[in-house]
C-alpha cells in the first residue's frame, strides 16, 4: 500500500474524506506513525501538497483524536511540500499555535491580539513594549516555533519586536482571522464533525420561511433595562434597548453566521454580538433586523480583545416598537425656516428626512431654506412627491446694501478747512435701545491738529457686567459719582457745535448719540459724519483688516489702551488726519464729494450682510431665485455669496421676502433703532419671522440682550411692527437637525471650522419642532397670539404659495439645423465608402433600425455634436477613444464618433467591396478572422465587427437618452471643452457641477478632534454613531472631470439650474451648474469630454515614428504574443520577472497581468473578454476564474461583457426582448427572476451560465472594452516594433515617479532592485509602488538592449524623454522633487548660455542644494566646479 493510499484509508477511517479538498485527498501521504506503548502516544507524520484551511485542520485534528481516543493520545506532525501563501496561513494558524504553548489563558489572549508579519522563514510578532517582548520571548519562543512546524510551516525563528505605533487600524487585517475564526474555530470544527456524523441536512435548507420580527432567546423584562452610558465594566448579565445604526452579518467558513449590531439609546452606544445557534433559525431572525429598528437585548458585557472595548455577547434579543415623537396639536403648523445637509458644514439631515418627518406629523407643508444655496431643491421635490406634502422652496441669503456710505449727512465743507469731532463711546452693551453710554470721549481737530478734548463718564444706575468691565476697564466705582447721561449729552452737543463727527464704525457710535439726543428732545444730529472704518476699506483696499489696532500700526499711531474711549479717540484722530491727506491725493476735497468720488463697483464687499429669507411663490419666482443665487455666487461673491438690495429688487417678482433670524436686518433694527424706524424697515418685507426664545438664549449669555424680559420686549416690538405694516408675523424654527439628540453632530461640524463665528458661543437647540413645542415656546405671548403666529399665519402664508416644480420632466436638447438629414446622409455616405454603393442588407437593416430610434426620439443632434467634437480633434491630430456603450451604435461608427464596429464579424474587400458576415456567434471578433484575399479581385480583405447589439445603447425600444462618453487626449481636452463654446455660445455651455460631502474618514477626524478638545472619552461604537451623523454633509462643490452641460438655444440656464464657480473659486475658467449634474441629467444634454493618457501617448508615438495609428494591424502576431509571453520582445520571463510582455500596456496592472497569466489569451476577442472581466464586480473572482480553472469552459465562452449575455442568449434561441431584460437585470446586479431562469432552461442554457449570471454585481460594456483593447493593441505595436519610441512615450506621458539613480545602472542591478521591491511589496507605500512600476519598464528596456543616460544639462528637455542612439535622456521634471516651473527655468537659463558652476546653476535656475547634490550623484554635473573661476576675459 502506498503512502497516498494509507492517507486515504486514514481519512476514510476518521470519516472526513468528503470534507477534504480533492487535491489534498489524492496527494496527501501518511509517511509513518511513531508509537509509544509506554506513554500511550501515537504521532502521525503526514505530508500534504498544500496547507489545509485552518478550519479543516482543526476538523482533521478533532476527528483523529476522537477516533483513537480509547487507544492512545494522538498528535500529528505535518509537512507541506508547497508552502505558497505560508504567510497568509500563518496568520490563520497563529491562535491555534499559541494555544499549544504553556502560557496562561490571559497571556494567550493578549498575544493573540498582536500583529503578525511573515518574511521568508522568519515570523515577526509586533508587541507593545520591551517588557512584553522579553516575557513572550522567554515564555514561548521555542514552543511556538515547534507548534508552527508541527502544522507544516517552514519557520527558522520567531522574533518579537516592539511597535510603538501599533494602533487599532494596524490590526484591522486580523479581525476575521482572530476575532471570528480563531476564537470560534475549535468549537465550529467540533460542531461540523458532529453534524457530519449525525448526517443531518441543515434545517434552513428545508425551511426558508421569512421572519418578520426578530425574537431570539427569552423575553427581556423591561424593569431590567439600564442606560448604555451606565455600562462601564464587564458584567455577567445586562439588559439594554436601543436603535440600530449599523448591522453586519457575516458567514464564517464553518457555515455559521455572526451578527454584529451597533445600537444607541442616545446616552451612549454599544456593540452587540451573537452567533447563530445549532439547529435554530437564528439567521432568519438576524435578517429581519435593519438600521432604524429598535431592539431590546440581554447578555454578558465583556472586553473584546480585538477592538479593545466593551461589547455585549447577546443571549437574548427582541425587536420592539418604540414610541416616536408625535405632533399632537389638532391644527398643525408649517415650518418656513429649515437647513439641510446642503447648508455647508452646518445643517445635518438631508431634506428627505425632514419631509418624511413633517408628513408623519401631519404638517400640510414644509419649506427648505439653506444658507446661500438651493442645492436641496431636486431632492426636496422628489421627497415631497413621495410623501404627499406641499414643498415650499426658499433660501436664507445674505442681503447687503449696494453701497455703504462713508460720509453721512453730506455738508458743503472743504475737508482741509473743516473742524472735526473725533469721538468714541463706551456702553453697557451693543444695543442703543436697551443699553446705556458709560463714557463719552472726543477730541476736536482743526488744521491737522487736536485743539480740544472732551471726556466724561455717565452713571448707568446699574451694575456693569464682567464682560464690559474686562473690555473697557471701567468699574462700577468709577461711575458712582458720575453725572447723568442727559447732562453729559447736553454739554457734549453744545461743545460739538457744527463740527463734522468722525468715528471708527460710526453707525454704532452715532446710534447711541442720536438715540440720546432724541430722548432729550433734540432730534437726531444734523452734523456731517465720516466713518473711518468704511473710509479705510475704500482707500486701503490692499489691507485685509481695518480694525483700529491694525490701522494704528499701519499708520504709525500709538494706541495705548484700546477700548477706553479717550485713547481710542486720540488714535482715531491721528489716523484720520493722515486719511484726509490720502483723500486729497485721490481728488476728494469736500465732504459732499466723499461718497461720490470714493464709491466703486465693489462697494457691496464693504457692506455688512444681513440674513434674509427668500420664499418662492410661483414658477416665475423660482427662475428669479435661480438668477439671484447665480449672481450672488458669480458676480457678488466676497467671502460669502451676497445679494445686493438692487439685485433683489430687480428679481423680486414671484418671491416672498422674510426677515430671517437674529442676524436679519429687522432684528438688528429693533436692537439699534426706535420703533418708527423699525416699522419703516419692516415695510420692505412680506413676512416677519420670530424664532423660539431657546434659539436666542446665546444672545443673553453673551450679553447682547440683557435678559429674558428684554427679549420678550423685542418680540412685542417685532409683532407690533408686523401689525403696523400689515404683514404677517410667523414663528419659524430655524431647524438645523431633526431631533434634539442630533445636535451633537452640528457641534462637531462647527468645531471643525476654527474661523466659524458660531464657535464663539454655545449653539442653541435647533431641532425640528412640533406644533406643540412651538406653541409652548411662545406661551408668554398668550394662547391666542401664540396660535396666530405659530399655526394660523404659517398656514395662511403657505396657502399663498403655488405648486412649484424645480426640475423639468423631459429632455431639452439643443437644436442644430438639418441634424436629422446630416446624420442620415453621413451614415450612409461612410457606409457606402466602406461597403460599396450596393450596401449589404445587414448594413441597411442595422442603419435603418438605429436611425429610426435616433431621429425619431430627437437624438440626432446629440450624435452630430459628438461627431463635430471628434472631427475637430482628429483634424487637429489627436485620436479619440470612445467609452461606455457608444460603440454599440453602428451609426456612431459610420459618423466616425467611435472606431468600434458593432456589426457581426465580417470581411470587406477594400477594392470591390465584397463582404462576408458571420452571424452564428462562431467568431468573437472580426479581428480574429484568418487573413484572406478577395475571391473576386484578390485584394487582402479588411476584417471588422465586434458583434454588439444596438439595444445596449439606447434600450430595447431605442428611446433611452444616449450617453456618449469620449476619451480625448488629456493635453487636448481643454481645446475640446472650449470648442463647445464655439458650437453653442459661451452662455450655453457649463461644466457639470458636483457636490462634495464630508467623507467617513474625514468625519472620523472631526469627531476625534472634538472629543479630544472637550476632554470627552467615548467608546468606539459611540464614535461610529457620531461619525455617521457628520457624514454626507456638504463640504464643498466641484466639477465633473469632463462633463459639459449644453443649454438649448431656445432656453437659458436658469430654466434648469443656477450657476456658480467650482468651490466658489472666482478665478476658475468655467462656471458650473449649481445643482449636482445628476439632478438634471435627464433634462439637459451632458457631453462627456474626458481626458485620457492613451490618445496623448498615441499622438507622441505618431510624432516620433510618422506612423498613422489607424494603419496599425490589429492582429499582428508578435504583438498578440506579448499578452501571453515576453518572447517577441526578445527577453525571457526570468529576465523581466514577468510571464507576459505587457508592462506599460494600457489596462495591464498587476491584477490584470495575473489574469493574462491565468488565461493566456491569443485573440482580440479574448483580450476584450479580459478587459470586461477585469472591470466587472464578481465577474472574474469566484466566477469566470473558477469556471476556467475547473475546465467547465474556456476564456472565450465565459461571460466577460454585458453585451455577451444578450448575444449568447439570442443565439441560444431566446427572444431579443427577453435576452435584453436578462442582460439589464444581470448588469445591475439584480440577478435573475424565476421567469428568466425558466426561459433560459427551456432554451437549454447550461446551469453554469445561470449560476454565473446570478453572481454578477456589475459588468462592463463590450464596446467600452473593445475601445480600450484597440488602443492598447496600437500602443503594444510600438512596444514590439519600435521600442525606443514606446519607452520614450511611456516615460513622458504615463510615468510620474522616477528613481534615476537606479535607472541609469546596468540591467542586472535594475533587475535586482525590482526583485528586492517585489519581496517587500506589501510594505511599500504608494509612491514606492509607482517607482516600482517605472523600474519594471526600465528593467525590461535594459534587457532589450537599451539604457537610460543621466540627466544632461546640455540636452535634457523640461518634460520629454528624448532618444539618442540606443539610449534615452530623461527630462528635468523626472528629478524627484523638481517641479514644472523649475524644469522650464533650467531650459530657459540654458538657452541664455552654459552654466559655469553649481553656484551659477543655483542662481540662474533656482535649484535647491538637495537637487544639485542629486544631479551630482547622478553624474549630470561632470567637471562643473562649485564656484566659477574668474578669468581675465571676464573683467
UniProtKB/Swiss-Prot annotation:
InterPro entries: DNA_pol3_alpha_NTPase_dom, DNA_pol3_finger, DNA_PolC-like_N_II, DNA_PolC-type_N_I, DnaE2/DnaE/PolC, DNAPol_HHH, DnaQ, Exonuclease_RNaseT/DNA_pol3
Cellular component terms (Gene Ontology): cytoplasm
Enzyme class: transferase
SMART domains reported in the protein's UniProt record: EXOIII, POLIIIAc
Segments crossing the lipid bilayer: none
GO BP: DNA-templated DNA replication
Exonuclease domain mapped to chain residues: 420-576
Record has Hydrolase as a keyword: yes
Function: Required for replicative DNA synthesis. This DNA polymerase also exhibits 3' to 5' exonuclease activity.
UniProt family annotation: Belongs to the DNA polymerase type-C family. PolC subfamily.
PANTHER family xrefs: DNA POLYMERASE III POLC-TYPE, DNA POLYMERASE III SUBUNIT ALPHA
HAMAP family: DNApol_PolC
Protein name, entry field: DNA polymerase III PolC-type
Species name: Staphylococcus aureus
